[in-house]
Regions:
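The beta1-alpha1 cofactor-binding region of Rossmann-like NAD(H)/NADP(H)-dependent oxidoreductases
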Residues: 42-52, 84
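Canonical Rossmann dinucleotide-binding motif of NAD(H)/NADP(H)-dependent dehydrogenases/reductases
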Residues: 1-16
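Active-site-adjacent segment of SDR/Rossmann-fold oxidoreductases
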Residues: 12, 127, 148-159
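Active-site helix of classical SDR
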Residues: 102, 138
Length: 172
């Protein structure tokens, strides 16, 4: 989902910064859209890496007006077979990674009194689904987070949105 979102944004003339743990496919886009595209190899579980990449993006582009959190991790096991460490790991990427990202970008948006944050979620965060309890739980938590942040930052003209893409075949 993310790669094609990036391609479309760049093709439409937007400046794009990407924080991703896997960057090999991004080199192709960098060669084509050099001045409008930067990327950083970042593990969203690492506060310092996230903050450093966001700070560099703001310095390079001068503004962060739209931010999309699209990272996710999903495991496929029954709930009884899923240990707590798996839950913690999936939450650390999907939910706490989103929170780290927001905490890094929000100062730039509040300074400009403008911004839009989009979280990629899933219908299973609302309905639930078998054999992906950690993933579904994180998406439900993201839904609640977006609602809370939408209220808290309305005064700063910063909006928070949830995107529910259709079922896709992706590596997560």
């Amino acid at each position: 989902i993310g790669y094609y979102m990036i391609k479309k944004l760049l093709a439409d003339g937007n400046r794009v910064s990407v924080l991703d743990i896997e960057t090999q496919n991004l080199e192709i886009l960098k060669n084509k859209y050099n001045s409008n595209f930067i990327f950083y190899k970042v593990d969203l579980r690492n506060n310092e890496e996230v903050k450093m990449a966001v700070d560099k993006t703001a310095k390079e582009f001068g503004i962060i007006d739209i931010a999309v959190h699209n990272a996710c991790k999903c495991t496929f096991k029954s709930e009884i077979e899923t240990d707590f460490d798996t839950y913690k790991d999936v939450f650390d990427v999907n939910y706490f990674g989103a929170l780290r990202f927001v905490k890094s970008i929000i100062p730039y948006m509040t300074a400009k009194k403008k911004g839009k944050v989009i979280f990629t979620s899933s219908g299973v965060g609302v309905t639930g689904f078998m054999n992906i309890s950690p993933y579904s739980s994180t998406k439900g938590a993201l839904e609640a987070l977006a609602k809370c942040l939408r209220i808290e930052y309305a005064k700063d003209n910063i909006t928070f949105h949830i995107m529910h893409p259709p079922l896709t075949q992706t590596k997560s």
